[in-house]
Every structure is written in structure tokens, then in C-alpha cells.
A protein has these predicted regions:
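Bacterial Sec-dependent N-terminal signal peptides
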Residues: 1-26
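C-terminal outer-membrane/trafficking sorting elements
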Residues: 17, 479-488, 492-558
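Active-site/substrate-binding loop(s) of hydrolase catalytic cores
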Residues: 158-308, 316, 320, 347-349, ...
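Beta-strand-rich domain onsets/edges
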Residues: 366, 371-392, 463-464, 470-473
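A short, amphipathic beta-strand motif
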Residues: 393-400, 429, 469
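Short, acidic Ser/Thr/Gly-rich low-complexity loop/linker segments typical of extracellular
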Residues: 404-436
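A short, solvent-exposed beta-strand micro-motif common in secreted/extracellular proteins
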Residues: 437-448
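Structured interaction patches on ligand/partner-binding surfaces of diverse proteins
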Residues: 447-473, 556-558
Length: 558
């Protein structure tokens, strides 16, 4: 009894001491880098739901990041840990470029200050106005710009071309891809007139490049230095755990969607990308879906082919041990370690875009003198991946009578799973389906149109199969659903669940009280999560079509 009383007396002291230690740890930064040991991958995956695992970890020793809230959750597990120096503070000879006029852009052995980065991006547009358009897709927590460069020979007129996205450094301390992306823009623009391969790329592909997805993390201290850059954004949130997740749903990290996350979701929604890659560092590997679960993607054979091509070219253009940490230089994401809320899975599942995660360097922030190596090693691979966008199955879907382009679902029978189907994009009606060699049966469907199936469609690796499709329009009737569809909770707050969608349903739409279409959704499965993002309170109608019949059900967002 006396021991129990003494324990009660000392508990407040221990709690106060731990709080004081935590406050001390987070005194100068909102994130901490630390290590600990685990005995199994299952235990590691469980812990990954709490903190951000560092992808360079090799069991049993694990490295990780946490903010103050998630670190306290980790401490509750009573796992011994060691505080480590942050990767962003490893090197000091980073060679910062503080003036664009101070150096010729030849060796690219420097990191630009934030102001020089912005100046460089807009200088590309000024120097090549017919090939490059720079756009700010939004602002960070601290007000810095999220810049993307659109590269194509047709900047203002939509064409029947695949749309490809390269984006780097959503983790602010992983910046080998930052300068690599800038150099890729420069290389493509400078060589367009003289190099037939480059000219073919920009004449046949709409390429978008975002060199820096988390400038607040990269320039954490000030705009003139990347030393001690942080993984997280200015709210100390891991942006690569902040996206809707196929398995864990909206807000898998328990945080609001960050300004950077919202900007990228809106951007990718508006463009409709077909192919993408997300650049990181801290390891060297090409990481393909899925990250969140162990499900094998429908396109695993295609992924293995394309990822092996990327890694093999990188090995050929570097010294022997580059891209050799994993077998053939590639890995399945979940087989490596589990990630919920990642950008890669969001793009594949919700945007129907083929995206992989590219880990470029063991050092998250390499010294400036080493940056040219990563360019020479990856240049051919980056170009080859862009060129993959014109291969596979592609075509245009139109109305059989008017020739009007359609937004249609392209579904491969006995093949597509986990949202692997793709959709044709307006205003052209073009679709791009990447497949390994084989023979396929495809069904094309669109709202208000009769579905059409094509059997025995042959596709070959690194070649293009063209299939244009005309769909016949239905005569429509409308029915109000009363019991088939369930929408809850009602009234809804930040999100609402819709369940009971028939398997045969085509695209679904959200209509406001005025009858205007405010959002279109690509059918995932029998249920869907609608978020209130950027919508006002009021009545809405959930609408979809089955065999030409329109069904709708009303609900309210508070």
C-alpha cells in the first residue's frame, strides 16, 4: 500500500519532467528526427500509422520523424529511442546561388535561394515563350509560391497528347530532385531546336514540372539557405501523409488538408494527368504502387517493365552501385514499408494517373558538387519515362452523331481492380491506357450513352495501339432514389459517405441547388466519400446513370 501511495506521489513529477523534456526537444523546431529498434515489419507498419518513417531504414534499426503531437503518441509505446541530427544539417558546403547573374548555368552544382528559384522559373518562360508557361498553383502556409512549368509546343490550344507530371521535394529536406527538375526544364528548352528526340517529346507530350513542392520546408530558416531544411511544411505536417487514402479514407493522418495538399489536389483535378513521378531522396530506388496496402496492382507487369527500364538506364549512366540497394533497383511500396496518405496512392487511386515514387540519392540534401552526378545518371531515365506516355492504348471517345468529345470510363474486363480504370479527358475526349503486352477486352461507358465493348485488342510493349470510339446516346428518363442509395450523416459536416452505388453506374456528379454541376466523380466502388472542400453550405443532389436512366438523391452540407 505504501509503495502504491509513493507511486501516486511521484507520477506528477514524472509527467512534469517528461513534458519539460518534450518542450526542450521541440524548442527550436516543430519536428524531431530519431531512431529506435523494432523486431518485425508488422510492428513497423503499425508504428507507421503514428509517425513518419524514414525510407532509408533497415530493420531492426529505424529512423523516423515526428512533430510534437505524434512524438507524444510514440512515447506512449514505451520504445527506447535516440535523438539524431536532422538529415538537413548533415552538410554545410551546399553552394548556394544568391544571384542569377552571378553564375552561368552550366555545371548546375548549386542550390538556388528561394528568390533565385522563382526568378529562374519565370526566366524560362521569358526566354522560351512558345514552349514554356509558368503558373503558380497556390501558396504555402508561409506564402511562398508553388510553381509549375508547362512545357509543350502548344501552350494555349489543347491537343490529343498525354499529360505528364514531374514533381519534387514535397519533403523539404529531400532536394536532390529540386535542382534536377530545374536542369531538366533548362535542358528540354535549350535543346528543342537542335535535338530531334527532345523536339519529339515536346511536340507530342504536355509536360508539367514542379521542382519544389514544399518550399517552406526547404527554406525553413530563411530564403537564402537550405541548411537544416525540414521534412514537414510550416505547420509541421508531413505532406506525404496528408492525402486521401484508398484504405484509410480522408485525413488518414488526423490533420486538416494542408494548403500545399489542397493546391495539388485542385491542380491535378483540373489538368487530368496520365503519367507522373514524385521525386524524393534518402534512398535510391524506383518505388511503384501500392504503398497503403499489399494488394497487387492490376498493372504490376507494366510497372515492373517500366521501373526496370528506369533503373537499368540509371545504372548504365552511373557507377556500378547506383540503383543497386534493391533487386533490379525497384521495389513495391508496401513490401518496403507501409504508407497511409501518400501522394503516389492518391494519384493512382483517385486521379487514375500512373505515378511512381523516385528515390534519387542516399543523402537527402547532397552537397552541391555532387548534383551533376545525379543529372548524368538520371537524364536518360527521365526522358524514357516521359516517352512511355505515348505508348500503350490510346484514342478519342466521341458522340456517334455530333462528334462531340466525351468524358468516358475505359474499363478492362477481368483485369481492372482498385480503380485502375482510366477516363477520357475533355476537351479532346482522349484517353491513355498504359499496358504490358497482351490481348484485352475493353468497355467504354459514359453518362447518357450506351456502353460499347471491344474484344481482342492487342497491345505491345513500347508501341502504340490506337482505338477511337464512338458512343450512341440514350433517350433518358429520371428516377428519384428512395432506398437504394444511402447518404450519411445528415445533415453533413466536412464530409459525407455515399453507399449503395450500383456496380453498373457510370460517372457520378454533384449538383447544387441551382442545378449547376459542381463536381464530377469517377466511380471507385459501391461507396464514395464526398468532402465539402471549397463548397458552401446548402442542398446538393448526388446523381449517376445506369443504362441511360438518371438516378438522384438529395442531401445537405451544413
Amino acid at each position: 500500500m505504501l509503495r502504491f501511495i509513493l507511486l501516486l506521489l511521484f507520477l506528477p513529477f514524472f509527467a512534469t519532467a517528461q513534458t519539460t523534456r518534450i518542450d526542450s526537444i521541440f524548442k527550436n523546431a516543430g519536428e524531431v528526427y530519431f531512431s529506435f529498434e523494432v523486431n518485425s515489419k508488422e510492428e513497423l507498419n503499425s508504428i507507421s500509422k503514428i509517425i513518419s518513417l524514414d525510407h532509408g531504414s533497415i530493420l531492426p534499426k529505424v529512423f523516423a520523424y515526428a512533430n510534437k503531437r505524434t512524438f507524444m503518441h510514440f512515447l506512449a509505446l514505451n520504445i527506447p529511442y535516440t535523438l539524431e541530427a536532422s538529415p538537413g544539417s548533415k552538410f554545410t558546403d551546399l553552394n548556394m546561388l544568391l544571384s542569377l547573374e552571378a553564375k552561368q548555368l552550366n555545371n548546375w552544382d548549386f542550390y538556388p535561394s528561394y528568390d533565385v528559384y522563382v526568378e529562374m522559373m519565370y526566366a524560362f518562360e521569358d526566354q522560351y515563350p512558345d514552349l514554356c508557361k509558368v503558373t503558380s498553383i497556390g501558396n504555402t502556409v508561409d506564402g511562398r509560391e508553388l510553381l509549375v512549368a508547362k512545357l509543350t509546343d502548344s501552350l494555349t490550344v489543347a491537343q490529343n497528347e498525354p499529360k505528364v507530371l514531374y514533381t519534387s521535394s514535397m519533403h523539404g529536406d529531400e532536394i536532390s530532385g529540386f535542382v534536377l527538375s530545374l536542369r531538366l526544364i533548362d535542358f528540354l528548352l535549350k535543346n528543342y531546336e537542335s535535338d530531334p528526340e527532345i523536339r519529339s517529346i515536346l511536340n507530342n507530350v504536355e509536360l508539367w514540372i514542379n521542382p519544389l513542392a514544399n518550399p517552406d520546408g526547404t527554406y525553413r530558416n530563411n530564403n537564402n539557405s537550405i541548411f537544416n531544411a525540414s521534412r514537414y511544411n510550416a505547420n509541421w505536417i508531413d505532406l506525404n501523409r496528408n492525402y486521401p487514402d484508398p484504405e484509410d479514407g480522408p485525413h488518414p493522418d488526423g490533420n486538416p488538408y494542408q494548403p500545399e495538399t489542397i493546391a495539388f489536389m485542385n491542380f491535378t483535378d483540373s489538368v487530368g494527368f496520365d503519367l507522373s513521378s514524385n521525386f524524393h531522396s534518402g534512398a535510391v530506388v524506383a518505388n511503384y504502387p501500392w504503398d497503403t496496402w499489399s494488394n497487387i496492382t492490376a498493372d504490376v507487369d507494366w510497372w515492373l517493365q517500366v521501373m526496370t527500364q528506369y533503373a537499368s538506364l540509371a545504372q548504365q549512366n552511373s557507377f556500378n552501385d547506383y540503383f543497386s540497394q534493391f533487386e533490379n533497383g525497384i521495389t513495391n511500396g508496401n513490401e518496403w514499408y507501409e504508407v497511409a496518405g501518400g501522394r503516389q496512392d492518391y494519384m493512382n487511386y483517385f486521379e487514375h494517373c500512373r505515378e511512381f515514387t523516385l528515390e534519387l540519392s542516399d543523402d537527402k540534401t547532397p552537397i552541391g558538387a555532387n548534383l551533376p552526378f545525379y543529372w548524368e545518371a538520371n537524364k536518360a531515365s527521365l526522358l524514357a519515362y516521359i516517352q512511355q506516355s505515348v505508348f500503350g492504348l490510346r484514342g478519342v471517345v466521341t458522340d456517334s452523331l455530333t462528334g462531340e468529345p466525351l468524358s468516358a470510363k475505359v474499363f478492362i474486363e477481368n483485369y481492372d481492380i482498385d480503380n485502375s480504370e482510366v477516363y477520357s479527358h475533355l476537351p479532346i475526349g482522349n484517353y491513355h491506357r498504359y499496358l504490358s503486352s497482351g490481348v484485352y477486352s475493353l468497355t467504354f461507358s459514359a453518362d447518357e450513352y450506351v456502353s460499347k465493348t471491344f474484344n481482342n485488342v492487342s497491345v505491345l510493349n513500347n508501341e502504340t495501339t490506337y482505338l477511337d470510339v464512338q458512343l450512341v446516346k440514350h433517350n433518358l428518363t429520371t428516377r428519384e432514389l428512395t432506398t437504394q442509395l444511402k447518404i450519411y450523416p445528415q445533415p453533413a459536416g466536412d464530409f459525407v459517405f455515399v453507399a449503395g452505388i450500383p456496380e453498373q453506374a457510370n460517372n457520378v456528379h454533384l449538383i447544387d441547388a441551382t442545378g449547376a454541376r459542381v463536381r464530377s466523380f469517377k466511380l471507385k466502388d459501391s461507396s464514395i466519400v464526398l468532402t465539402k472542400r471549397n463548397m458552401s453550405s446548402g442542398q446538393y443532389h448526388f446523381v449517376y446513370y445506369v443504362n441511360g436512366v438518371q438516378y438522384s438523391k438529395s442531401f445537405i452540407f451544413e
